Design a protein with these regions (language model features):
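Short linear motifs in intrinsically disordered
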Residues: 1-7, 88-99
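Solvent-exposed edge beta-strands and adjacent loop segments
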Residues: 1-74, 125-144
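Hydrophobic beta-strand residues in large extracellular and virion-surface proteins
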Residues: 14, 60, 103-105, 165
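Short, structured patches in soluble enzyme cores that scaffold and shape functional sites
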Residues: 64, 107-109, 150-152
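Charged, amphipathic alpha-helical segments
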Residues: 67-93
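Short, surface-exposed beta-strand/loop "edge" segments at domain boundaries and coil↔beta transitions
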Residues: 71, 108-118, 156-158
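Phosphate/anion-contacting hairpin/loop surfaces
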Residues: 92-115, 123
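Mixed-charge, glycine-accented linear interaction segment located at domain edges/termini
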Residues: 119-169
Length: 169
């Protein structure tokens, strides 16, 4: 039986498509929720008699700060970095699977990512959605919140799987 250190606290390194996304501010949050339908009968009123699993939703919220354009280009739909900066175009109709890549979170130990493969969480296919809230003042940090939605893998040895704790290979 695996002994993943879920009780540990502290930051993690985040890599999307093998690109280190850099610093975070406010905590990285992983969520996984099983979606169910409740089964009831007219004869038993509102009493739930059974449940049926409809699927699951996995996501990771990553509040990035002090980012370089090259780090966030692939996270902002319609973004392209050129020699003059970054330009963002409308991305209406963009399918998430077309930009989804592997997301790896690795627990930090003594200021560096752990080399223990058991201290990783992997979303095999993660579709990034950015929510930019950049303040321009003298008292706050600019945060680019990116939510990665886990999609079932469709192109590797993990077909149908969404995430794992442990060795990212």
């Amino acid at each position: 039986m695996s002994n993943f250190p879920l009780e540990e606290t502290g930051p993690c390194q985040i890599k999307f498509d093998d690109i280190d996304l850099g610093y975070t501010k406010g905590g990285v949050k992983f969520k996984d929720e099983v979606k169910k339908t409740e089964i009831t009968y007219d004869q038993t009123g509102e009493t739930i008699q059974d449940t049926v699993t409809k699927g699951r939703a996995a996501s990771v919220d990553v509040p990035l700060t002090n980012s370089q354009l090259a780090q966030i280009e692939g996270l902002i739909a319609g973004a392209v970095v050129d020699v003059d900066g970054m330009v963002v175009s409308s991305s209406t109709g963009l399918r998430g699977r077309s930009v989804a890549k592997k997301l790896v979170l690795t627990i930090m130990e003594d200021g560096v990512p752990s080399i223990d493969p058991k201290k990783t969480l992997v979303l095999f296919k993660a579709d990034p959605t950015s929510k930019i809230d950049w303040g321009f003042d003298n008292s706050g940090q600019r945060i680019t919140l990116v939510t990665f939605v886990g999609l079932p893998d469709d192109a590797s040895g993990n077909v149908g799987k969404m995430w794992r704790i442990g060795n990212p290979a």
